[in-house]
Structure formats: C-alpha cells, structure tokens
C-alpha cells in the first residue's frame, strides 16, 4: 500500500509541477523576463520526479494502475475522471518531458527577441499538458479533451507569426484537416455510447460486440487526420510555417503521435479484426512510401524533416497493422529523441543563416557549425536505423517482424522501398547543407557557442545514442518474438538502408556536374508532392466555385430574377392581350395608318383653302 501511495504522490507532484507555471500567468510573474526560465525549470524538475514512479512501475512488474473519481451520472451512464497508468503512459511521460525540457531551453535562444516570448512558453507548456491528458486518459471523454487540446494549441502555435499569410493559412489548414479526423472520433464515441453505453476503455474491451468495423474505422479516420496519414497529410509540411521549436515539439512528442497512440490504446479491439488490420497496414505502407518520395526532392530543410516524420508515422501505422502495438510505441519513444534533435539542429542552422531554409543556399557548415553538424549527422543516422543508435532498436525490429509475419508482400515491399529512401533524403540533407563549399552570404556571422543552444542538443544527442537501448530493454513485448530467422531476412533492413545511402551519394555526385535539361515526370511528381495540394487545394475549389457561379447565374439570375418574374409577366400580358383584342400589336402599321390619316386631313384643309 505504501508503494502505491508513493507512486500516486510522485505522479501528482509531476503533474502539479507542470500546472504551476500556468497558475503563475495570473500573477505579475507572467510579465517578468524570467518567466521562460521558470517554465523550463518546472519541466526539468517534473522530468526528474517522473523518473521515480516510472522506475518503480517497471521494476515492480505491475500491469497497470487505474485511478477513478466519479464525476457525474447522465441517466444510465456514469462519467468518471479516470487515469490509466500502464507501460505506455508511464514510459511516454518522462520521454515527452525530457524532449520538451530540451525544446524549451532551445526556445530561450531561438525566440529571445520575440516580444511575446512569455505567451509562447505558456502555449508550449499547455501543448505538453494536453498531450499528458491524452496519454493518461482511461475514457473516451478525457481522451477527447486531450485530443482537442493538442489540436487548438497546434493552431495557436503554427500561426504564431500571424502577420504572415502563409502562417495563417498553415494554421487553418491544420485545423481543417484535423476536423475531418475529429468527425471519425466523434462518430466512434457516439457508436460506443449508443451500443455499449460506456466510454470507459476497460468496459469497451470486455463487452463483446459482433461488428466493430464502424467505430474502428472512425478511430482510424481520427488517427489519419492527427498523424497525417495519406489523404489528410498536406497539413504536416505546411505546419513548418510555425517557429522551429513548435515544429520540434509538434513532430517529436506531441500532436502527430497522438493518432498512433489512439490506435495503440484501442488495439485490443483491432487484434482479431482482420479487415481493420489490413486497412491499417495498407494505409501505413502507402503513407510511408508516398511521403518518402515527396521528401526526396524538397529543398526546404524543415519540409524534408517534416516529410520524414510523416514517413515514420506511416511505419508506426504499419506496425499496428501487423499486430505489434508495443513496437509502434517503442518507435514513438525512440523517434522523439532524434526527430527533436534534427529540428533543433535545423533551427540552429536557420537562425545562424538569417532565416535561410533552402539547402541549396547552405553548404560547408561542417567548418563553422561543428557541433550542430555532428548532431545532425548522428540524428540522420539514427533516423535511417544505423546499428546501435536509437532508431535501430525500433526500426530494425519493425522490419524484421514485418518480414516474418503473415503480411501481404505489397505492403512489405512499399515499406522496404521507403526505408531505403529514408537513407537517400538523409544523405541529401547532409550532402547539401553540411559538405562542399559555402553557398551563403559571406557577411553572415555564425555563432553556436550559446549554452542555451548547445545543452539541449547535447542532451538529445545522448538520447539519440543510448535511449533506444534503455527503452527497448524496459518495454515488455505483447506477443512472442520470432525465434529463428534466415540471415537474409535479418540483414534486410540494413541492406536496403545501405543501398539508399549508396544511391543517394551516387546521384548527388552525378548531379554536381550534370543537370537534367528537362525535369522528368517522376521528379515533378515528387517535387509537387504527388500533385496532391494542386488537386485538393486548387482544382477542387475551382470546380466547386465554378459550379456555384453557374448555379448562381443560371438558377438565381437567369431563371428566377429574369425568366420567372419580368419575362413571364410580359409573356402572360402579351398572350392575354392578343387573346382578348383583335389588335396584333403591329406598332409600325398603326403609326403608318395614323400618319396617312394625318396627311389626308392636311391635304383636305389645304385644298379647302
């Protein structure tokens, strides 16, 4: 009992540490220049305290701890405030806090000249808190609060520089695409309420219903919107219009992994539903390949990293599709470290080059930004799944499991090609941004000696090297791993990754001296993001607008305002006058007869005189 009390008190301390800076916003401290420092310190302390219950939980061998507070009863349904602390939430909380701590410290350097930096830090903290609510929720209502919370905070943070049209458009785009996903979530909530009369996860899992395709498809739609899967993915690269710390937090430990986390939470329902698994697998495979293709030809450093996130999210969805939720969760945790670090390194480069994001205008940075360069290379290698870095422990396992599971060969092939492309676009970033000769303005002064820049990247660098081993050692698998495997399957992931590296280097070296006279169709497809934004954002609105214009002009103007009223009145008037009178309305003839009469009268008067 004492262990549980200590456990509960340490968790409460962690969460209260996070809410303290929010409470301080109502005092004069919020106007103080040291407020960002307070927020950063609060998160660092919360991380250190959160390690205590996590360590206790892992080594005590518990399955989960659920705390329940009755809130209200609506007719027959009981609504509770219920927190579920299992392996997933207990490991994710310290990871999210650690990554956010580093991002907050980096923000103090990156956003130092922003007049509203205190508000920025408050928004970032609220973003983290809503994610914590989502992760620890034990019922759909709390999950929905966290879900909508990360949605609205992402809108406020992506549109932070609201004086720019692009930032406003990107923020609105993020909200609108997520609205489509939210429809699926609300549909699933309504279905569970009507059919099972509960929103509690445990009660949903134990109540056997014959056909769960409708709510599961709703949840998959919700995950597609939030985790930027194919079809609802265009908002993710657009979200790069926000400040770099926002991109780092959005892509590492909050918003985008929420969709994958939702599917992990509801995995017990999907476990024996083959239709749902196949749909999830195919969606993930298409996403991971399509976004990897798009990343190959982008020139904006942040957009390349954004597409790599979408590709990794596709890989996580593939993992859920092959019935391995613990592996998907492991990839969420390992991905958070190196993805946050990649964004912080790109932020360091962008800030030092006076907000230049085009990799064609960089080059030679290994001489002037040695620490950033080292971190970027380690992060890129971790992303590609280089052995014994963080990414290897999850990515290699996922591909091995996919190779040996009863999956369809098509989805597996797409995933392997996408893995190869990951190495290709990572090589491209390193080649263009870091190597060769400088291609930027020589007047730029570059300095990476601020501890606010070095320390967070250093922490994430250590995480990108060691975290994978530590986390994989402490996550218990939910299914029996493959005992035996042929050598060629074991080395498949490494082989395709090395192939990607070699091809990318070969292409980069070739394109230095030779350039395509006319870009190929494949290049256009990749560079224009598969024509997706053009079709969705240009062609479809144009069709809708032209149809509405025709309806307005034909239906309203021509038919109602012209034909139905004035013309019909004149037509009926003419018909009735022709029917009633003998006169045919030949006005020229009438005038002629009138003139003839007048002339005859004049002639008679003249002759009389």
Swiss-Prot record:
Main location per the UniProt record: mitochondrion
Residue ranges crossing the lipid bilayer per the database entry: 3-23, 41-61, 90-110, 115-135, 140-160, 174-194, 214-236, 244-264, 276-296, 304-323, 328-350, 368-388, 410-432, 460-480, 491-511, 585-605
Biological process per Gene Ontology, one example term: mitochondrial electron transport, NADH to ubiquinone
Pfam families given in the database record: NADH5_C, Proton_antipo_M, Proton_antipo_N
Lipid bilayer topology: Multi-pass membrane protein
UniProt EC number: 7.1.1.2
Substrates-to-products reaction catalysed: a ubiquinone + NADH + 5 H(+)(in) = a ubiquinol + NAD(+) + 4 H(+)(out)
Cellular component per GO, a single term: mitochondrial inner membrane
Domain of life: Eukaryota
Keyword Translocase part of the UniProt annotation: yes
Keyword Membrane included in the entry's annotation: yes
Top enzyme class: translocase
Location(s), subcellular: Mitochondrion inner membrane
The protein's assembly and partners: Core subunit of respiratory chain NADH dehydrogenase (Complex I) which is composed of 45 different subunits.
Entry's family note: Belongs to the complex I subunit 5 family.
Function (record text): Core subunit of the mitochondrial membrane respiratory chain NADH dehydrogenase (Complex I) which catalyzes electron transfer from NADH through the respiratory chain, using ubiquinone as an electron acceptor. Essential for the catalytic activity and assembly of complex I.
NCBIfam families for the chain: NDH_I_L
Protein name as catalogued: NADH-ubiquinone oxidoreductase chain 5
Organism (species): Halichoerus grypus
Gene, per the UniProt record: MT-ND5
């Amino acid at each position: 009992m004492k262990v549980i009390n200590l456990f509960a008190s340490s968790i409460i301390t962690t969460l209260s540490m996070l809410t303290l800076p929010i409470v301080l916003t109502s005092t004069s401290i919020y106007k103080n220049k040291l407020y960002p420092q307070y927020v950063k310190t609060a998160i660092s302390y919360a991380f250190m305290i959160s390690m205590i219950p996590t360590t206790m939980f892992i080594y005590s061998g518990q399955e989960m701890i659920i705390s329940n507070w009755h809130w209200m009863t609506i007719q027959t349904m009981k609504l509770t405030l219920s927190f579920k602390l299992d392996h997933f939430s207990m490991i994710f909380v310290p990871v999210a806090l650690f990554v956010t701590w580093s991002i907050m410290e980096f923000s103090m350097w990156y956003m130092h000249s922003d007049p509203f930096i205190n508000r920025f830090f408050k928004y970032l903290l609220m973003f983290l808190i809503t994610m914590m609510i989502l992760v620890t929720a034990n019922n759909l209502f709390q999950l929905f609060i966290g879900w909508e919370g990360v949605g609205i905070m992402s809108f406020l943070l992506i549109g932070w520089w609201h004086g720019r049209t692009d930032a406003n458009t990107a923020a609105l785009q993020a909200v609108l695409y997520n609205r489509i996903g939210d429809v699926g979530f609300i549909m699933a909530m309504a279905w569970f309420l009507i059919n099972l009369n509960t929103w509690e996860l445990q009660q949903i899992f134990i109540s056997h219903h014959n056909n769960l395709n409708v709510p599961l498809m709703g949840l998959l739609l919700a995950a597609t919107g939030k985790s930027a899967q194919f079809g609802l993915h265009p908002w993710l690269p657009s979200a790069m219009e926000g400040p770099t710390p926002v991109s780092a937090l959005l892509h590492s430990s909050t918003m985008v992994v929420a969709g994958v986390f939702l599917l992990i939470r509801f995995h017990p329902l999907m476990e024996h539903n083959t239709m749902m698994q196949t749909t999830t697998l195919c969606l993930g495979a298409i996403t991971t390949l399509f976004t990897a293709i798009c990343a190959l030809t982008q020139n904006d450093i942040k957009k390349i990293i954004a597409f790599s996130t979408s590709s990794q999210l596709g890989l996580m969805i593939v993992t859920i599709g092959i019935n391995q939720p613990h592996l998907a969760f492991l990839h969420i945790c390992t991905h958070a470290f190196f993805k946050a670090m990649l964004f912080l390194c790109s932020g360091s480069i962008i800030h030092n080059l006076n907000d230049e994001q085009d990799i064609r205008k960089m080059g030679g940075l290994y001489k002037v930004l040695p620490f950033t360069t080292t971190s970027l290379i380690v992060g890129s290698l971790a992303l590609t799944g280089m052995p014994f870095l963080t990414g290897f422990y999850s990515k290699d396992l996922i591909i091995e499991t996919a190779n040996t599971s009863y999956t369809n060969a098509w989805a597996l092939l797409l995933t392997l090609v996408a893995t190869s492309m990951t190495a290709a676009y990572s090589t491209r970033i390193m080649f263009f941004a870091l190597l060769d000769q400088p291609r930027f303005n020589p007047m730029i002064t570059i300095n990476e000696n601020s501890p606010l820049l070095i320390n967070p990247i250093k922490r994430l660098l250590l995480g990108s090297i060691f975290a994978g081993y530590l986390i994989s050692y402490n996550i218990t698998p939910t299914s029996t791993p493959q005992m035996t495997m042929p050598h060629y399957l074991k080395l498949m992931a490494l082989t395709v990754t090395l192939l990607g590296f070699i091809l990318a280097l070969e292409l980069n070296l070739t394109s230095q001296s030779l350039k395509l006279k006319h870009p190929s169709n494949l290049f256009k497809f990749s560079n224009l993001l598969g024509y997706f934004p053009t079709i969705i954002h240009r062609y479809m609105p144009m069709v809708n607008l032209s149809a509405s214009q025709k309806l307005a002009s034909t239906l309203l103007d021509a038919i109602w305002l012209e034909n139905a009223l004035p013309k019909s009145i004149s037509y009926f008037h003419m018909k009735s006058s022709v029917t009633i009178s003998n006169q045919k309305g030949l006005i020229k003839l009438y005038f002629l007869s009138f003139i003839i009469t007048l002339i005859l009268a004049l002639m008679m008067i003249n002759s009389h005189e």
